[in-house]
Amino acid sequence: MKLLLFTALVLVVISLIEVEAENERACIPLEKECTKTPGNCCSGLKCDCYRRFEQGVAKGIQCWCIEKDVTYKGV
């Protein structure tokens, strides 16, 4: 019985350590691509996505970490 309780306690501790490690993963810095992980930009940044066109044909969506209060306009 004690072995069973000890094993359960060890498993709980290991799972808590894994969750904490996942929460501390490295964030994506300014102007780096965040298409696959949009919620992982560093503090003060947001993941902003754009649809890319080549000769009028959509070629997919690309996302970049940019500053939260900055707006970009085409030239």
Swiss-Prot record:
Expressed by the venom gland. GO terms for molecular function: toxin activity. It is found in: Secreted. Residues 1-21 form the signal peptide. Residues 22-25 form a propeptide. Contains 4 disulfide bonds. GO terms for cellular component: extracellular region. Keywords: Disulfide bond, Secreted, Signal, Toxin. It comes from the Eukaryota. Belongs to the neurotoxin 19 (CSTX) family. 06 (U6-Lctx) subfamily. This is U6-lycotoxin-Ls1d. It comes from Lycosa singoriensis (Wolf spider).
